[in-house]
Curated annotation (Swiss-Prot):
InterPro entries given in the database record: ARFGAP/RecO, DNA_rep/recomb_RecO_N, NA-bd_OB-fold, RecO, RecO_C
One Pfam entry name: RecO_C
Family: Belongs to the RecO family.
Function: Involved in DNA repair and RecF pathway recombination.
Protein name: DNA repair protein RecO
Gene encoding the protein: recO
Alphabetized UniProt keyword annotations: DNA damage, DNA recombination, DNA repair
GO CC, alphabetical: bacterial nucleoid
One BP term from GO: double-strand break repair
Amino acid sequence: MTERLKLTGLVLRAVDYGESDRVVTLLTRERGKVSGFARGARASRRRFGGALEPFTLLVAEARERPGSDMLGLESVSVLRAHGGIRGELARIACAGYAAELSRELVRDHEPHAELLALLLEYLGALDAGPARPEGLRAFELGALRAAGLMPRVDACVACGGALGPEGRVRFDPGQGGVLCPPCAPAAAPGAPWVSIAAASALARLQAEGLAGASAALPPSVGREARDALAAFLEHHLGRRLAARRFLDEVGPLLGD
């Protein structure tokens, strides 16, 4: 008999399997990102109820399955459902994007307390209030920090020189951040120019985190910050996330 495990985690993804089963991806405190197989989850609500839904924080009892990396889920109890998120399309889009980004940034079976705490903080904010682009930028920056991929936006990534009070700089994902005008010719082809205001906004959100996301950014600055981080993430992930495409479609709903 395999050892019974007790895990506290957040549901990042849930996929129906066959006629009655469900496969979930959890970000857990104890084992990091894991996959779990819930036999009969859709046929009977006795063991799992409605707990195996994205964004749910839960405690799961599970066992390792011989010959498989996937855990067998036996029962779960909900700690926080984040039900407020599901009542508004913009909040669903932001939460889904945050969950997919978290899933892509970490490897299986590696505990990642910093990212889990950040994701719970962000989902808690979405559960309690409206989705805002500044919060999403703060989450992206925090997730990149947790994954060791934080871009340099407070100074030139090449020479370390301070950025001027105004003007524009190049944002080069391959080099890891902004390039001042003298270093800008070394940027990769297609690396965008961004305003000092956008770079400064990203630096502030990087330093203050979600707590600093209450101050609204001017629309043009917000768009530059969004596009710069989107390019950075695509460069490092190697693709555009599916949830990002959905988020772009509902962007006007949150002013993004």
